[in-house]
């Protein structure tokens, strides 16, 4: 049977196709693709055709494909100005795999990371006092800068950071406008601020580097990743890496883990506050669990079922990445439809995670869907995809889950939280490829008593 033409979603008659709709309501656009076209449909993103896959069979093709067939590098033009040339998304598949196999994410390191995360949380809340109010985006974005830098680069580097690094990093993430598919260097405000923020981060890292060079560590045990990179020499005997290159490496190492953990932590707390029965169950679970006197570094690596189910349901409803992109490097057929070389091929956690045939009452918050016998995450391995799936499952998934468990093992045992604005007012800002919580996103806290 010969392949049939790819169906195209309605609309998109402007010069850049569906780009403006993708900038303003990407989830609405992608849901319309599924509703009108089924598991395989297309929309137009500037000069590129995007083949959006959804549903189990189409997603399986997407997640099983290797880099030789579907390549990430050219699918994210907005990343090169952020990372710099030659870093991760601008590198070859082999180099990316080498970079992403970060020793810090290996299992034997996790216990130390859990203790580090607990320490960072306690430092962040040290001046909270008995009661107050925070903005979730501000708080968790700064906290996860400190946790990710401490765990992935080293506590020594983290201790030389302050709130400036977090603010600049946030501005960098705001520079991921889909207009990058037209030109990632367009003279628009968010790209100008992106470039200024990156220059600011390079200046901060260069300042730290200069201090390290002036006072090199005398003891090997006192070295972190920055010291190691500074010490690497080229054949000429000069430093192998510039401050710009090292900053790019650090940005790339922290990038996926930072915004995913920040957003997921925020939404986990929002959903707990929206659903007081789930909140009470998690509090009871944590109080009983930590009643044995053991540390966060012990329990965060073990099962915390109620909290984990809340986390899974939060990830299903609010996936930190709403679309995953690749570029087709050959001709392929998916469910009778032909994909051509050069096409952008996409999968959408935001759409697949809410397919009603796989997830009954898909828009409802139901942590029990992960309990036996339902286990909807395991049953639907190609549509429960907040971390991707198959060979492209996120390398940091275990770290991300452990981090959230460690964060809430501290926060929920120390403080009670309640919403400071209407429940429906908490929402994501989808105007950028890196999804952020929209502000304001305020909550009130009060120290727990009698614990």
Curated annotation (Swiss-Prot):
Record GO biological process: sterol biosynthetic process; sterol metabolic process
A Pfam family that the UniProt record links to this protein: p450
MF (Gene Ontology): heme binding; iron ion binding; oxidoreductase activity; sterol 14-demethylase activity
Binding site for heme b: 72, 76, 97, 326, 392, 394
Cytoplasm among keywords: yes
Predominant localisation class: cytoplasm
Keyword terms, alphabetized: Cytoplasm, Heme, Iron, Lipid biosynthesis, Lipid metabolism, Metal-binding, Monooxygenase, Oxidoreductase, Steroid biosynthesis, Steroid metabolism, Sterol biosynthesis, Sterol metabolism
Cofactor(s) recorded in Swiss-Prot or TrEMBL: heme b
Localisation: Cytoplasm
UniProt EC number: 1.14.15.36
Reaction it catalyzes: a 14alpha-methyl steroid + 6 reduced [2Fe-2S]-[ferredoxin] + 3 O2 + 5 H(+) = a Delta(14) steroid + formate + 6 oxidized [2Fe-2S]-[ferredoxin] + 4 H2O
GO cellular component: cytosol
SUPFAM superfamilies (UniProt xref): Cytochrome P450 (SSF48264)
Regulation (activators, inhibitors): Inhibited by alpha-ethyl-N-4-pyridinyl-benzeneacetamide (EPBA) and 4,4'-dihydroxybenzophenone (DHBP).
Disulphide connectivity of cysteines: none
Function, as annotated: Sterol 14alpha-demethylase whose physiological substrate is not known. Accepts electrons from the iron-sulfur ferredoxin Fdx encoded by an adjacent gene. In vitro, catalyzes C14-demethylation of lanosterol, 24,25-dihydrolanosterol and obtusifoliol, to produce the 8,14-dienes stereoselectively.
Protein family according to the UniProt entry: Belongs to the cytochrome P450 family.
Entry-linked PANTHER family: 24-HYDROXYCHOLESTEROL 7-ALPHA-HYDROXYLASE (PTHR24304:SF2), CYTOCHROME P450 FAMILY 7 (PTHR24304)
Self-association and partners: Homodimer.
Protein name, entry field: Sterol 14alpha-demethylase
Species name: Mycobacterium tuberculosis (strain ATCC 25618 / H37Rv)
């Amino acid at each position: 049977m010969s392949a049939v033409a790819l169906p195209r979603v309605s609309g998109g008659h402007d010069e850049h196709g569906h780009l403006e709709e993708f900038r303003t309501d990407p989830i609405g656009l992608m849901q319309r693709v599924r509703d009108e076209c089924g598991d395989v449909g297309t929309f137009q993103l500037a000069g590129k055709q995007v083949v959006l896959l959804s549903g189990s069979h189409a997603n399986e093709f997407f997640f099983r494909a290797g880099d030789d067939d579907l390549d990430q590098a050219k699918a994210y033009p907005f990343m090169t100005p952020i990372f710099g040339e030659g870093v991760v998304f601008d590198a070859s598949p082999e180099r990316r795999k080498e970079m992403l196999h970060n020793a810090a994410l290996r299992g034997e390191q996790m216990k130390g990371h859990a203790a580090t995360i607990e320490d960072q949380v306690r430092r962040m809340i040290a001046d909270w006092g008995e009661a107050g109010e925070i903005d979730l985006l501000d708080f968790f974005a700064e906290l996860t800068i400190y946790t990710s830098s401490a765990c992935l680069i080293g506590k020594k580097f983290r201790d030389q950071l302050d709130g400036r690094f977090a603010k600049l990093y946030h501005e960098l993430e705001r520079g991921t406008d889909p207009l990058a598919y037209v030109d990632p260097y367009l003279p628009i405000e968010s790209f100008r601020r992106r470039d200024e923020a990156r220059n600011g981060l390079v200046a901060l890292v260069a300042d730290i580097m200069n201090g390290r060079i002036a006072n090199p560590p005398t003891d090997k045990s006192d070295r972190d990743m920055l010291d190691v990179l500074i010490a690497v020499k080229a054949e000429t005997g000069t430093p192998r890496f510039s401050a710009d290159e090292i900053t790019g490496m650090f940005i790339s190492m922290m990038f996926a883990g930072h915004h995913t953990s920040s957003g997921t932590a925020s939404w986990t707390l929002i959903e707990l506050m929206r659903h007081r029965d789930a909140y009470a169950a998690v509090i009871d679970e944590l109080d009983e669990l930590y009643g044995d006197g053991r540390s966060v570094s012990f329990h965060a690596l073990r099962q915390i079922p109620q909290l984990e189910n809340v986390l899974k349901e939060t990830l299903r409803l609010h996936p930190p990445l709403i679309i995953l992109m690749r570029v087709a490097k050959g001709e392929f057929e998916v469910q009778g439809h032909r994909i051509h070389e050069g096409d952008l091929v996409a999968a959408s956690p935001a759409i697949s995670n809410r397919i009603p045939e796989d997830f009954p009452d898909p828009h409802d918050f139901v942590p029990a869907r992960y309990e036996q016998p339902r286990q909807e995450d395991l049953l639907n391995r190609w549509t429960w995809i907040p971390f991707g799936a198959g060979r492209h499952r996120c390398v940091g998934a275990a770290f991300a889950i452990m981090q959230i468990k460690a964060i809430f093992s501290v926060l929920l045992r120390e403080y009670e939280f309640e919403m400071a604005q209407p429940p429906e007012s908490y929402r994501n800002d989808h105007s950028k490829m890196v999804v952020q919580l929209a502000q304001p996103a305020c909550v009130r806290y009060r120290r727990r008593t009698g614990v």
